[in-house]
């Protein structure tokens, strides 16, 4: 399941984020690469321990955990703290699958979901599409600044070469309370239907029944 979430951050907020990011020292992006990815990856990143990157990453996590659509789709249990990357001058990251397990200060997490928060407007760079191969075929993603795409970490994906301009983004992984992608999809669809019916002031008893089904499925499928 691939979910696009628009306007997680406003244009003004993105501009403020970029001012802080652009002033930092960027390093070789292979810091977070697995052994097989190093030959395919050419980009720049902020060091994961950079204090500005850490603070902005926390701001992003706080925003996402307060976003109903993100929480509904991801059912987040634990984040790998957001990182920041930049592509320019032909830089690219060829097809790869993200590492299944990552180490955090609090221990190991299983990467169920990957997310990219775009911090450059699409008209400001040529190329740089996030191309994802999933069960529905190939999808090419290039969202407006402040918008986010969420997709299974098991997906084969790439960032195409940035031929002109600059593509800056935040990227992150997370472990979901529900490991199985198909089960997460069903729960998301059910939750979105419940929210839609609630907005339409549907019959109270039916909403209680549907909500009970949702929570009983979540209870059955979740791993904490």
From Swiss-Prot:
Residues that coordinate or bind 2-oxoglutarate: 167
Cofactor(s) listed: Fe(2+); L-ascorbate
PROSITE patterns in the record: FE2OG_OXY
Residue ranges of domain Fe2OG dioxygenase in the record: 78-176
Keywords linked to the UniProt accession: Dioxygenase, Iron, Metal-binding, Oxidoreductase, Vitamin C
Binding positions (Fe cation): 96, 98, 157
Single GO MF annotation: 2-oxoglutarate-dependent dioxygenase activity
Pfam families for this protein: 2OG-FeII_Oxy_3, PKHD_C
EC number: 1.14.11.-
InterPro entries tied to this protein: Oxoglu/Fe-dep_dioxygenase_dom, PKHD_C, PKHD_hydroxylase, Pro_4_hyd_alph, Pro_4_hyd_alph_FE2OG_OXY
Note accompanying the cofactor annotation: Binds 1 Fe(2+) ion per subunit.
Domain of life: Bacteria
BP terms from Gene Ontology: DNA damage response; intracellular iron ion homeostasis
Enzyme class, first EC level, given as a word: oxidoreductase
SMART domains per record: P4Hc
HAMAP family for the chain: Hydroxyl_YbiX
UniProt cross-references to NCBIfam families, sorted A to Z: PRK05467.1-3, PRK05467.1-4
Protein name: PKHD-type hydroxylase Sbal_3634
Organism: Shewanella baltica (strain OS155 / ATCC BAA-1091)
